[in-house]
Amino acid sequence: LKDIMGRLGFTVAHGPEIEDERHNFEALNIPKAHPARDPLENFYLATAQKLQGNSAGPMLLRSQTSTVQIRVMENQPPPVRIISLGRVYRPDDADDTHFPMFHQIEGLLIDKHVTMADLKSVLRLFAMSYFGGDVHIRFRPSFFPFTEPSVEVDMQWHDRWIEMGGAGMVDPNVLRAVGYDPDE
């Protein structure tokens, strides 16, 4: 995975698994009233908040690897071309497709003149390199607070489609939250 994305010009970035609300939600354009912030949908950590000091806000186990993207953008001017791989945590009931801890991979490409066509091309190239040249993927319109436009990416497996994940162009509000100019 790292080799494939490395050939496409991406480097690997890492971030903490214990996060604050700014990196896990606010900078990702997820408002306070959004269902993704519900305490029943996250693992909030009272002990971590105490260790950070009384002025610290709530701390939680990260619910997505998008937090790494925020940290990279806060510390690096464009262009940015990274992937982040890591554990994420959500209080899901364990079954065949869910578990309270699972792994995510994300990519981030920030540069001038990058389009949705570029995103789709990178995802197709990755899928062909990882799963084989005859892989079929499709893109369905979707919504994520941190991307606009947003898509779900599916891969054909035998006679059915399997969701690979979500994707999209970084929302201008996310770019502003890290000090980037969305008009550039």
PLM regions: where:
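TRNA-recognition modules of translation machinery and tRNA-sensing kinases, especially anticodon-binding
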Residues: 1-184
